[in-house]
Amino acid sequence: MLLQYIQSPKLLSFIHVINRFYRSNFYILFIGLLTVLSEIFGWELPVYYLYVILGGVIPLFFCEDMISIIAPFSFGYFTVSLKHQNVNEGVGVTLFTSEFMIHLWILIALIALCFITRFIFDYKKGKRIHASKNMLGFLILALTFITGGLFTEKYGIHSVLFGLGVVASFAIPYFSAYFLVDFEKEKKDYFARVLVGAGFVLIAEVLFAYFSHFDAILDGTFSGEMVRTGWGVKNNVGAMMVFTLPAPIYLALKHKRPFFYLGLNLLFFLSTMICQSRNAALVAVIGEMILLVYFFIKTKYRLLSLVTILFFVLLFVACAFLFSNLVSKMFDSLIWTLQNFSIEILASGRFDVYQCALDNFKTSPIFGTSFIEEPVGIGAPPDYFLTDIIPARYHDTYLQLLSSTGIIGLIGYLYHRYVTLVPFFQHKTSEKWLYFFEILVMIGVSVFDCHFFNIGPGIIYGLALCHLDQVNQIDQKERYLFSFEKAMN
């Protein structure tokens, strides 16, 4: 913001260094390091202050845009430490004490002030914002969510707030990036690099979870339930890991030597398996096959890429063989699931919950029964919603929509899905494929779980939608200018 008023060459040179830093891998890695430290040591509050200073305050005064918000948005969900989780008392987080909430509201006010100030400044400089069809999609989705359970006894402010919160989880990062990031200056691979950074953050946190229970691994009592962080259990961590799979494939196609990124993709795939989430594993297997087919169709280095994949596969197999006793103890439940695979095992006794969702839908097919109607089999206490904010759910996004919001909510979701996919089909590019795969991941992980209603997936999803929209607008503009120049010549 102060860039245009500075005349000193030395100071201008320093500010240009700051701008390059925010677009570099070093910034992404630094935010990732802060995130891991927060999750391991319980340093959420100081890390949040650093997030706001680095992502909002400094860029407000010294940067061309606020690309600095992409990494903190993407990693912020992973900061909550297990130290602040009431593991012995059931679901609930002790992080949000009254003292912490005072700091949190200060931080929210500060970052909101930075965002609004930047938006006004950019607008006065002449920046114009083009309307997006996603804006209408978000509005319709929000309206259908807040009417979920209308005319039923469970309908109330808690259900309304939860519905708005779901839409806000991807609308806030979407609009923040949409209004504050200059996508014409953003390198096309920037978001992919952020997703790779997210992959490393998740791997570090999963490894910490394993090492925290190393005694259980050695004595054979380790289970997938021990793969948990302060912000989620194995299903949450596994789902977020799946979101990182497309990025290395995109980067492999963008670089002349794709072999490093192929290795990263396989590492992220293996890490998804290590999370021991059956839902995430299923989506990862299907998604990985689709990604590799896409890669081999597009790449010029098919033979070398195949050799690279075989090398990493053999490396993983050799490591598993060398440490077979340890591996069998760590993944006993996952190995058993693979050996005895069936839909019933995959669903993990959720059919009663699914039937409950269908029964609720039948009782109120138009507006549903609200988000706070408790599913059978969850075992949530009466005050579950008030103590944990997020209500018990049906482990299936689409049944959740029918049960909680009825036909109206399903229509709102389908319209939202339509407008999110339209930009992809308008002149496909490699960047659009990346964001399209991110949307497919959200659809996939939501089949046997409710990740569409979770904050972390919502943030990545919202940023992917924003990038898809902006890339489409830039692509249309470039093709129009090319056609115009061609016609003039």
Outline where the language-model segments fall.
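Long extracytoplasmic/lumenal interhelical loops at the membrane interface
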Residues: F341-T405
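Alpha-helical transmembrane segments of multi-pass inner-membrane proteins
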Residues: I146-G149, A171-I172, D189-I217, W231-I297, ...
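Loop-to-helix entry and N-terminal half of a specific, functionally important transmembrane alpha helix
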Residues: L195, F260, L264, A392, ...
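Hydrophobic transmembrane alpha-helices and their immediate junctions
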Residues: Y301-R302, T308, S404-I443, E478
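Flexible juxtamembrane loops connecting transmembrane helices in multi-pass membrane enzymes
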Residues: F222-R228, L306, A320-C356, V376-G379
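N-terminal signal-anchor transmembrane segment
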Residues: L2-Q7, F14-F119, T147-G149, M442
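Aromatic-anchored transmembrane helix interface
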Residues: L104-A109, K133-I146, Y155-F179
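Transmembrane alpha-helices of multi-pass inner-membrane enzymes
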Residues: F30-L34, G55, P246, H416, ...
